[in-house]
Amino acid sequence: MASVQLQNVTKAWGEVVVSKDINLDIHEGEFVVFVGPSGCGKSTLLRMIAGLETITSGDLFIGEKRMNDTPPAERGVGMVFQSYALYPHLSVAENMSFGLKLAGAKKEVINQRVNQVAEVLQLAHLLDRKPKALSGGQRQRVAIGRTLVAEPSVFLLDEPLSNLDAALRVQMRIEISRLHKRLGRTMIYVTHDQVEAMTLADKIVVLDAGRVAQVGKPLELYHYPADRFVAGFIGSPKMNFLPVKVTSTAIDQVQVELPMPNRQQVWLPVESRDVQVGANMSLGIRPEHLLPSDIADVILEGEVQVVEQLGNETQIHIQIPSIRQNLVYRQNDVVLVEEGATFAIGLPPERCHLFREDGTACRRLHKEPGV
């Protein structure tokens, strides 16, 4: 195992900066996930750690050693790519041992490591098969096993589940989580799927246009996003946003006016520092935190546009006339409502988020479980 540290790391191609002043501390044995939309720089960051991309400025340390100029093979890292990249003419055992053979490892060492890793990955009964005889999930396990037998200090995974169908992704997600718990290796995992990030990570790094938007534990990012980008990216369905105007402030409270015909006002338990009366801000509320209207004091009303029945839950898209945008309301179980009907939902102030015009969040003061 080894720690990974990035100090003011920047990557640029000519005038185009793809990673800017990245500062990260990844501790020994942590499972860290880089997550963000396409083009945010997450794979480039992983490739700089692996040595497949040069660092324009800043420093990379693996353990205590500065690695900027160290060749990839000498960094003690192993990488699994989105593509399995298996040799079709070689067996599972031969694919897994290929790197060790090139490195000149002894046959006894190779056999021992391959057999140990095959047991961990439940591949022992498949060692003599060729890749064409394997399922997608089995091929990905072979690709992971090929990296594991090299015993890297840091394990890098670049969107390894993207080529799998939905059921296999869930299965492999569980297997990767179990693998990390069993081996205790430092793992850095890249994905655009925030569900993978939330379920796998000890720590999530959210990237936006080459910058680190926020670093934290999954529930911390979910309940206390640092800005509007993180709030909208983490969580599915995404957070609802309403334009509001500040009408008053107090210690640890901000009063805002909702965009409704009755100009209803509500006090939000958020940090009021630097919040000015009259400021235009955004109120955020997650679909699952909205309430049935009969148990709430603050009511929003609109017309049902779309009803998505998922069996275990219902997602209702409601158009609020005064803001000409849809809110998504999510409730467990089946909710029977017709499209075109008028529907009212409740807004719990303690579950609301408030964002300044520059997108930064006013710190929520409501204590959430698990954080």
UniProtKB/Swiss-Prot annotation:
GO cellular component terms, A-Z: ATP-binding cassette (ABC) transporter complex, substrate-binding subunit-containing; maltose transport complex
Predominant cellular place of this UniProt entry's protein: membrane
InterPro entries: AAA+_ATPase, ABC_transporter-like_ATP-bd, ABC_transporter-like_CS, ABC_transpr_MalK-like, ABC_transpr_MalK/UgpC-like, Mo/tungstate-bd_C_term_dom, NA-bd_OB-fold, P-loop_NTPase
Domain of life: Bacteria
Domain annotation ABC transporter: ranges: 4-234
Alphabetized PROSITE patterns for the sequence: ABC_TRANSPORTER_1, ABC_TRANSPORTER_2, MALK
Pfam families found in the cross-reference section: ABC_tran, TOBE_2
Keyword Cell membrane: yes
Family, as annotated: Belongs to the ABC transporter superfamily. Maltooligosaccharide importer (TC 3.A.1.1.1) family.
Record protein name field: Maltose/maltodextrin import ATP-binding protein MalK
Organism: Escherichia coli O6:H1 (strain CFT073 / ATCC 700928 / UPEC)
